[in-house]
Design a protein with these regions (language model features):
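A short C-terminal boundary segment appended to hydrolase-like catalytic domains
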Residues: 206-269
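C-terminal/domain-terminus segments
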Residues: 50, 58-76, 147-173, 230-255
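Conserved beta-sheet core of the metallophosphoesterase superfamily
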Residues: 130-189
Length: 269
């Protein structure tokens, strides 16, 4: 099958944009949002830590890429589709890298391909964009930054959070699942290709700095007065009582109280 990555992608973009901007959509509810605002306002702690279930970062992918992900997750994983996926990702990443390097030769059409973005999961905070912006506005007003802890997706993520004006408001540290399957099952594509997806995701999704899409494990976060250290830890298998920590895929981030990196260690197979 051949994927149409133009008209349908545009329709999805228009429909989802309208829904996301509905001010009546709420993930917290009025009472919980008021409680959270009061807690943030009264807190004297060094760290403002928000533990909750779903991703808060803007996980916005090029609209045509969302079509590909939908096709794959529906089970349409044929050699032809995989070849199209590879080509599409290669094209989008190349355009995005040229854009980041301020390439003046990019065409309007090419720029549109990477700037026409849609959320891939409206059950997360991306589906409640107005309320998320309200929360970010509260943080800005209080002159506080937040460390958001998340899960839900069964995959590991790290992101920098920004409001719609581009102001940095915090970081998100999201854990993988201990045993439940992640994208390695839902996308049903080879592990090596998933690793290529990881690289593509961190290039194409502006807020995303790290992801692991195929391994099970946990996230260990340690707070001191001087820094927060996050360690993503993965095991080589969950199908056997005998397992080892896969140190080749570990990831560590250390941040100071302003949430700027003290150091970062990446080891990616």
């Amino acid at each position: 099958s051949t994927l149409d990555r133009s008209s349908a992608a545009s329709d999805v973009y228009k429909r989802q944009t309208t829904d996301m901007q509905d001010p009546n959509r709420t993930l917290l509810g009025l009472n919980q949002r008021a409680w959270l605002t009061q807690q943030l306002a009264s807190s004297k702690a060094t760290w403002q830590v928000l533990g909750q279930q779903v991703l808060m970062s803007k996980m916005l992918v090029p609209a045509e890429m969302l079509q590909v992900l939908s096709a794959i997750s529906s089970g349409a994983v044929t050699p032809e589709v995989l070849a199209q996926v590879n080509q599409l990702i290669k094209e989008l990443v190349e355009i995005k890298l040229r854009y980041l390097n301020h390439d003046p030769s990019l065409t309007v059409e090419q720029l549109s391909r990477i700037k026409t973005v849609v959320p891939y999961n409206l059950d997360s905070w991306d589906g409640y964009a107005v309320e998320r912006e309200t929360l970010y506005g509260t943080l800005q007003y209080l002159n506080k930054k937040v460390v958001v802890l998340a899960g839900d997706t069964h995959n590991a993520w790290a992101s920098d959070l920004h409001d719609l004006t581009g102001q940095f408001v915090g970081v998100e540290l999201a854990t993988s699942s201990v045993s439940s399957p992640g994208m390695e099952k839902y996308l049903s594509i080879p592990i090596q290709q998933l690793k290529e997806f990881e690289s593509a995701f961190t290039t194409l999704i502006d807020e995303l700095s790290y992801c692991n899409l195929n391994q099970r494990g946990y996230l260990k976060v340690r707070f001191t007065a001087e820094q927060v250290q996050a360690d993503w830890i993965f095991v080589d298998t969950i199908k056997n009582k005998e397992y080892i920590v896969d140190e080749t895929r570990s990831h560590q981030v250390i941040l100071d109280p302003t949430l700027l990196p003290v150091s970062a260690l990446k080891q990616t197979a």
